[in-house]
Amino acid sequence: MSEGIYGEYPTSPVVYAACDSKYFMEHAAPFIYSANDIGKDVHIHICNPTEDVWTKSIILNADTDVRVTYTANDINLNTAGDHQGPVAPEAERTYYACLRFLYLQDIVLKASKVMALDIDCLLMRPFDFPTTAIGYFPRDPLPDTAGWEQKGTRVAAGIFYIEDHAHAVASQIGNRIGLGPFNWFLDQIALAEVVDFIPKDQVTEYDDNFMDWNFRQGTAIWTGKGDRKHNNITYVKAKNEFDRYKSAITRCWS
């Protein structure tokens, strides 16, 4: 297992996200409740969890019907590895974007099947996990891009599915991320490079009829890309409807 990871591992197939404490407090409740409502067990990995995070995690666990588990790691990015001094904002942002892939092998070896998602995703309707060992979201590169950015935008990193017998793929993704550089799109670069070597008949390809950032009715997962997570009326309304945490406090302590 990865050095420094602690907490409770899942023991059943899960939807999985990873985040820091700020994003947990902002997005974890709607993510968990939306998964609960379609019967999917949940695992969340938290970097540098605060006491408020652990308090909220306990209440969310008590207020849901599905199994919800949490692991965590503690890290000072200013002194991580060979780095010394204030970490660049882009490198810090990239680390958190890559976080779920850094611990993916640990999680899938315990859970058997893992769908890794962004923490700001909402699960909008029931769905089955694929029958292949791997699932990912290929896409056309963004127009007018070249080099690193063009290569990175060939894959949407907001969804990635893996089964335990393909855990070496998770290891390869984590190892590629470890090579850096910690610039934006690193997670997508790692996915693109590793998945390129997997036979197509072993891979499920997702598209925007499954994971959707335009928030259309009938799609399975809504993902709050960029500012849309704050200013898109349709997404914000759905997020608020899923977020039953405030009433959970009353239910759990009454």
Where are these regions (language model features)?
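Catalytic core and acceptor-binding pocket of nucleotide-sugar-dependent glycosyltransferases
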Residues: 166-254
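Short, polar loop motifs at secondary-structure junctions
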Residues: 49-53, 119-127, 209-211
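A short, charged, and often flexible helix/loop element on the N-terminal side
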Residues: 75-98
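GT-A fold catalytic core of metal-dependent nucleotide-sugar glycosyltransferases
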Residues: 92, 96-143
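A structural signal for well-ordered alpha-helical segments within the folded catalytic domains
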Residues: 26-29, 33, 102, 185-193
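Conserved catalytic core of nucleotide-sugar-dependent glycosyltransferases
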Residues: 124-189
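Conserved hydrophobic/aromatic beta-strand scaffold that supports enzyme active sites
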Residues: 103, 159-161, 221
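N-terminal anchoring/stem segment of glycosyltransferases
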Residues: 1-82, 109-110, 164, 168, ...
